[in-house]
Amino acid sequence: MKLVSTWLLVLVVLLCGKRHLGDRLGTRALEKAPCPSCSHLTLKVEFSSTVVEYEYIVAFNGYFTAKARNSFISSALKSSEVENWRIIPRNNPSSDYPSDFEVIQIKEKQKAGLLTLEDHPNIKRVTPQRKVFRSLKFAESNPIVPCNETRWSQKWQSSRPLKRASLSLGSGFWHATGRHSSRRLLRAIPRQVAQTLQADVLWQMGYTGANVRVAVFDTGLSEKHPHFKNVKERTNWTNERTLDDGLGHGTFVAGVIASMRECQGFAPDAELHIFRVFTNNQVSYTSWFLDAFNYAILKKMDVLNLSIGGPDFMDHPFVDKVWELTANNVIMVSAIGNDGPLYGTLNNPADQMDVIGVGGIDFEDNIARFSSRGMTTWELPGGYGRVKPDIVTYGAGVRGSGVKGGCRALSGTSVASPVVAGAVTLLVSTVQKRELVNPASVKQALIASARRLPGVNMFEQGHGKLDLLRAYQILSSYKPQASLSPSYIDLTECPYMWPYCSQPIYYGGMPTIVNVTILNGMGVTGRIVDKPEWRPYLPQNGDNIEVAFSYSSVLWPWSGYLAISISVTKKAASWEGIAQGHIMITVASPAETELHSGAEHTSTVKLPIKVKIIPTPPRSKRVLWDQYHNLRYPPGYFPRDNLRMKNDPLDWNGDHVHTNFRDMYQHLRSMGYFVEVLGAPFTCFDATQYGTLLLVDSEEEYFPEEIAKLRRDVDNGLSLVIFSDWYNTSVMRKVKFYDENTRQWWMPDTGGANIPALNELLSVWNMGFSDGLYEGEFVLANHDMYYASGCSIAKFPEDGVVITQTFKDQGLEVLKQETAVVENVPILGLYQIPSEGGGRIVLYGDSNCLDDSHRQKDCFWLLDALLQYTSYGVTPPSLSHSGNRQRPPSGAGLAPPERMEGNHLHRYSKVLEAHLGDPKPRPLPACPHLSWAKPQPLNETAPSNLWKHQKLLSIDLDKVVLPNFRSNRPQVRPLSPGESGAWDIPGGIMPGRYNQEVGQTIPVFAFLGAMVALAFFVVQISKAKSRPKRRRPRAKRPQLAQQAHPARTPSV
């Protein structure tokens, strides 16, 4: 029995040890237990870049040796009499190969030297050298993860040196994941992202990323890191003599892609090529990236992960090199940015058509608050942005490799990017015909297989959540073809098709523009054969709409655009209903093989269209938003509208009703107004169709013809509402910044708004703004308001209504750090044109209350009241009888604000052009003219449901069956039309959680069962050994003897 007790004790110890071991296996990255009293550290990453003084990147129109490049530059500069120049040496692995650029330093006569260089026939472009900074900052956060674990979070930076404030990704994660605080502990546990996305299914099929070359552009990697077994090459592109990662970010990214143990990556057998492009001080240069990109092309990389970016999509050397990379069959994956939830905050290069742009979600499939939103802003003001991100995946609380081993958790889209890069690497290794793999085909597979998230629009989720197994199914039977993104246009489908679905179309309205991306998996170059064809469905009233096309003449690299303008025909001016049709386009690409020299591959794609038409609304309900006169960064330095926001120096979100004025647009739609966007001069719209023209935060100048036309329009009934912003040349000089590293000044090209231009526009009505700069809280009509860096009204007609307030003089505070209070500052003016049938004019000195960027208190109620006044002539009693109403200022004795001497606005203006002396207006451009496509009517019924997963040709997901390695693994099944995209799993368990949590319990139960069986056999053996042997019977002892030795009773 003692032996039995001993074995039972051993069993108990083993079971307890197994339970403890299971806990350790479930939380291998947690080196210590959570301690509520400890603070959790969040690592914030910020990016910025500056122009390096005297240094320029000379881009050639081909690849040349160092001797030839030197010869070209020398011969070009001889004629310019520039003597003090030199070529900056670049000692890196690509210096032994021909290059397409050189970095030079010119310290005298820069302008003459640059012009002479650009005139050389072998030189394509000369641009300034840029210095990139990345800073890492630790901040305390909620103590939800263990004390010793550091969660990283990244904040991207604009391409100017004043740093943007980092969003707190920890708090943003909680805002995004739901409302049930009792579930936070579950969400706080970092997940094994590879298993969550079911990469282990492909591993068990024998696919582990072997023979796929992956480039990781980051902070390097230690040589003997225990998580990696196939680091093929490490290269250093910095000025530091080390290849190791001294910060950990590059190690984490590489681990998500290819770690082989602990926090396992997607492709452990992939060939890792580590490009160290950041120093330990987090400094990099554009030239370092260009050299590294050239080397990646030379080494024939298959996949490249780039977890950095910024808003400067006009950084030509960088953008051009990204195009060249993808043209050389490098699949680039890049993070979309961490500037959410604001719209219009996409980062480059992820916003390029040929790059896979990745957004972030949490492990409950909610869009991460920090993830940047679309649309792209390249196309403004004349066009409309594209759908981005392309896909979303896990980017909050993801586990990856620590710098010295172990695991750590990070958050940010720079985390989501390597998740997709690792998935792509694994997918590429599954393709037998590797020649079918290219940036377009992989992107086609990812977006066609993505799972749509319910209740989220396309500018937040792109095509949906990454689905690794469905992407594998598609690539397994892929045939080269063209496809479209988005694959259909349904202006009635909300919320996915927001903002298109938020407003029906009608006759006389501005054409609705949909920007579709063409992906060409047949070749790096292609073209659209003939013209796109418009085929309306007659039974579905397709003849009530007309369409026009604008498209890429050449599809390169791997992609192009198809802009579709949709309008309503005159016969449907009073009609209401749904109209449908489809567009057919044929894409052709040259055959790549020598056997088919001169031949072409073709692919025909159908684009369904569905729109809702209503009768033309009354003029009073139609508001026209002026987009043409809004300027942004890039390319110019247009400063922020709220000077308090020192951490966000640039006005870079597009100032569009679907980007940083989204909430205002939503509010106007909820109030019954129809908002249209003008992307052309004032001479290009019919003012009789609109009740109010809305000018908000305008930075552009005005053509003289525009000023004259607007005066006529207002006299004939058009109303004008202007929300201005600050403008003060002294303050502009003050908010210029001096970069200590480059010793260069950056000067704003205008103020928050262009007050001199607005005053010229308003001068015919004796109105104008001042260059005063004011700030403060106040109450107007029982509403709390905040005036953020606004200007005042300098003059206004005597018979107008003017509202004043008491504010702080922010201009004095900025210039002299002194505080002063100014009473009776005119901020709001209302005026009725006296002529019969005349319109009304409203001026307000601050637009921040409408702008989503840094709004503290909205003034949507005020906009409602002003539109009631401009549309119906009803002056709000709360304003006309306000105690703050004062006599309108006459402007006497006040000098009007002047344009700042030496400004460079003409470089970025659509109105001004450079001229000797002051810039002069350009000739007025012609108004856009649309050529409507000739319809080819179809007498057939349109499909009832346009939303299907983008079926690529010759691919049937039902026929591609995945092996069932585990009997309890949920199987992937194709979506039927109209489904929400959820997995079909009994009990509603998400597949990632099922595999990770339930799957990990199987070995525990197996171990317990083995221990129970072992204990059973041990007990049986012990019983057998302790059983007494049979003995021969003996004669009984005398009774006396028995009484002398009484039996012992067992003690309990």
Swiss-Prot record:
Q: What post-translational modification information does the record give?
A: The 148 kDa zymogen is processed progressively into two membrane-bound 120 and 106 kDa forms in the endoplasmic reticulum, and late into a secreted 98 kDa form. The propeptide is autocatalytically removed through an intramolecular cleavage after Leu-186. Further cleavage generates 14, 10, and 8 kDa intermediates.
UniProt topological domain (Lumenal) ranges: 187-999
List, from the UniProt record, the residues annotated as the active site of this protein.
Answer: D218 (charge relay system), H249 (charge relay system), S414 (charge relay system)
According to its record, how does it sit in the membrane? Single-pass type I membrane protein
InterPro entries registered for this protein in UniProt:
MBTP1_N (IPR055143), MBTPS1_3rd (IPR057060), MBTPS1_4th (IPR057032), Peptidase_S8/S53_dom (IPR000209), Peptidase_S8/S53_dom_sf (IPR036852), Peptidase_S8_His-AS (IPR022398), Peptidase_S8_Ser-AS (IPR023828), Peptidase_S8_subtilisin-like (IPR050131)
| Primary enzyme class | hydrolase
User: Which biological processes are named by the entry's GO terms?
Assistant: cholesterol metabolic process; lipid metabolic process; lysosome organization; membrane protein intracellular domain proteolysis; mitotic G2 DNA damage checkpoint signaling; protein import into nucleus; protein processing; proteolysis
Protein name as it appears in the record: Membrane-bound transcription factor site-1 protease
